[in-house]
Regions:
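Glycine-rich beta-to-alpha transition loops that act as phosphate-gripper elements at the mouths
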Residues: 90-93, 197-201, 272-276, 352-365
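N-terminal amphipathic alpha-helix/helix-capping segment at the start of soluble metabolic enzymes
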Residues: 70-87, 178-186
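Short beta-strand/loop segments at the ligand-binding rim of alpha/beta enzyme cores
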Residues: 81-87, 189-195, 263-273, 345-357
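Glycine-rich phosphate-binding active-site loops on the catalytic face of alpha/beta enzymes
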Residues: 112-118, 296-303, 361, 367-393
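C-terminal helical cap(s) of enzyme catalytic domains, especially alpha/beta-barrels
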Residues: 122-137, 308-323, 383-399
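Active-site entrance/lid segments in N-terminal catalytic domains of soluble metabolic enzymes
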Residues: 2-17, 30, 34, 96-292
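Glycine-biased, low-complexity coil/linker segments
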Residues: 45-47, 68
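Glycine/Thr-rich beta-alpha phosphate-binding loop at enzyme active sites
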Residues: 234-250, 284-285, 289-351, 391-393
Length: 399
C-alpha cells in the first residue's frame, strides 16, 4: 500500500475530522482545485452548482461517463452511468469536502456518510483501533469462537490493515446535512455518482410503526436534495444483543414498502451485514426485491467481535462497547461469501437486482475477485483510507 496519511485521521475525534478533514492526499486534492463558494452555500461544499435568483441550486448538466479501459461499455450503478463501478461506502466520507476529494482522487462512487432524521451524537473517542486476528492471513470467520473470546485491538496499524468501526452512526441534523448533500451531489464529475446513505433512528418509547415512519421521513429528506438513488442501512441499527435490523427480513420488507411510498421510482439499495443462513438471506430478497421495493444490496458492512487489549481488558472505553464492528482485510472472505451467495439466490429466483460488494478491498485483485463473485459494483472503506490511490491503481490494472 501507499504511504499516504489516511484521509480520516484516526488519532483525532470524529468531530475534529468533520470540521478539519479530510487529510493526506484527499486534502491535497481539494487544494489542487480550489472550491468556488458563495454566501448561501454549504461550508463543506466541493464545486456547487449555479444558484437561481431564489437561492436554489440548479440541477447540474447531464454528465457522461467516459468508461474505464477494460470495463464493459456502459457501466452503471443503479441506473446511473459510471466510469468504473468502484468507490467508497458509507463511513469515512463525513461531508461534501470528503466526497468531493474522493471524486477528485478517482473514486467514481462516493457514499455520503449515513444520515438520520435528527442529530445523533458519536460514540466516545477512540472509535478506530487496529485489529489483529489470530489467523495467519488476518481473517475473521463469522461464527468463530474468537469473535466472542476476544480479538486484540491496539494502535499498531499494520498491513494488511483491519480496524474497529465504533462510531454509533452519528449524524448532523437535516438542516445541516441537506444543503451539504446538495453540494456533494453537484461536485460529482462526469461518470461519478454521489451515493446517499441513511437509516432510521430508534428512540426510547418509539413504536414499531413510528420506527418504520422514521425511515420513510429520512428517505424523503434525502429525496429533497435531488439524489438519484439511495442506500438504506440495516447493518448497524441494534435491535437487541447481537441482533441487527437486517436479521429481521420481514421488518426490513415493511420498512422498504414505506420508504418506496416516499421516494417513488428512485432506486433503493439495502446495506446488509453478514447473514449466515441461506434461508434467511433468501427471505430478505423475497421480502424486498420480490415485492418491488428494493433494487440492490450492498454487503457486507462489518463483522462484530469482542475487542480486547494486550491484557485481555475491554479495548474501547465505555459501557456497551465491549464489541465493535471490524472492517478491512479481516472481513474480505466473509464479504466475498455473501456476494457469491446473493448472486446464487439472484440466479435461483430469476430476480433482477444489483449487488455492491464491500469488505477488505485493498488491491486491484480484490476488486476483481468481487466482480468475479457476482458483484456489479465494489467499494472500499478501510483500504481507501490507507491508500488514496486505490481507485487509480484499479483503473490502471484494467486493460
Amino acid at each position: 500500500m501507499s504511504d499516504f496519511e489516511p484521509f480520516y485521521d484516526v488519532k483525532h475525534s470524529y468531530e475534529d475530522n468533520y470540521e478539519q478533514g479530510p487529510f493526506g492526499a484527499f486534502a491535497e486534492a481539494l487544494k489542487a482545485t480550489p472550491s468556488v463558494t458563495s454566501g448561501d452555500s454549504s461550508p463543506y461544499e466541493g464545486e456547487p452548482g449555479k444558484k437561481t435568483s431564489a437561492g436554489a441550486e440548479e440541477k447540474p448538466e447531464e454528465k457522461t461517463a467516459v468508461g474505464a479501459e477494460g470495463e464493459p461499455a456502459g457501466s452503471t450503478f443503479l441506473g446511473q452511468p459510471v466510469n468504473l463501478p468502484f468507490g467508497i461506502p458509507a463511513g469515512p466520507l463525513l461531508n461534501s469536502r470528503f466526497t468531493t476529494a474522493a471524486f477528485r482522487m478517482g473514486f467514481d462512487l462516493a457514499t455520503y456518510k449515513t444520515v438520520r432524521s435528527r442529530a445523533w451524537g458519536c460514540n466516545p473517542f477512540p472509535n478506530v483501533l487496529a485489529v489483529h486476528p489470530k489467523s495467519a492471513d488476518g481473517s475473521l470467520i463469522p461464527g468463530s469462537a474468537e469473535l466472542d473470546e476476544g480479538v486484540l485491538a491496539d494502535t499498531n496499524y499494520e498491513q494488511p490493515i483491519s480496524i474497529s468501526n465504533s462510531f454509533g452512526v452519528p449524524s448532523q441534523s437535516p438542516d445541516v446535512w441537506q444543503p451539504d448533500m446538495r453540494a456533494a451531489i453537484a461536485a460529482a464529475g462526469p461518470g461519478q455518482v454521489l451515493v446517499p446513505s441513511f437509516q432510521g433512528s430508534r428512540v426510547e418509547g418509539m413504536s414499531e410503526e413510528e420506527y418504520i415512519a422514521d425511515h420513510a421521513t429520512t428517505a424523503r429528506l434525502i429525496k429533497e436534495t435531488g439524489a438519484k438513488l439511495m442506500v438504506m442501512n440495516t447493518s448497524c441499527p441494534n435491535e437487541g444483543h447481537n441482533r441487527l435490523l437486517c436479521h429481521n427480513p420481514l421488518l426490513v420488507g415493511r420498512i422498504t414498502e414505506a420508504v418506496k411510498q416516499e421516494i417513488g421510482d428512485i432506486p433503493l439499495m439495502v446495506k446488509l451485514a453478514y447473514i449466515p443462513s441461506d434461508d434467511d438471506l433468501e427471505l430478505m430478497v423475497r421480502s424486498t426485491v420480490g415485492h418491488g421495493t428494493v433494487q440492490g444490496f450492498s454487503t457486507i458492512n462489518t463483522i462484530s467481535a469482542k475487542l480486547v487489549d494486550a491484557d485481555g481488558n475491554q479495548a474501547l472505553p465505555g459501557a456497551g462497547r465491549d464489541r465493535s464492528g471490524v472492517c478491512g482485510n479481516a472481513i474480505r472472505g466473509a464479504g466475498l461469501d455473501m456476494v457469491a451467495r446473493l448472486a446464487a439466490i439472484r440466479e435461483k429466483l430469476g430476480l433482477d437486482f444489483k449487488i455492491n460488494g464491500v469488505g477488505g478491498v485493498v488491491s486491484p485483485a480484490d476488486y476483481q475477485a468481487y466482480r468475479n463473485a457476482g458483484a456489479d459494483s465494489v467499494m472500499s472503506a478501510t483500504g481507501a483510507m490507507w491508500d488514496a490511490e486505490l481507485a487509480r491503481k484499479i483503473k490502471s490494472s484494467i486493460k
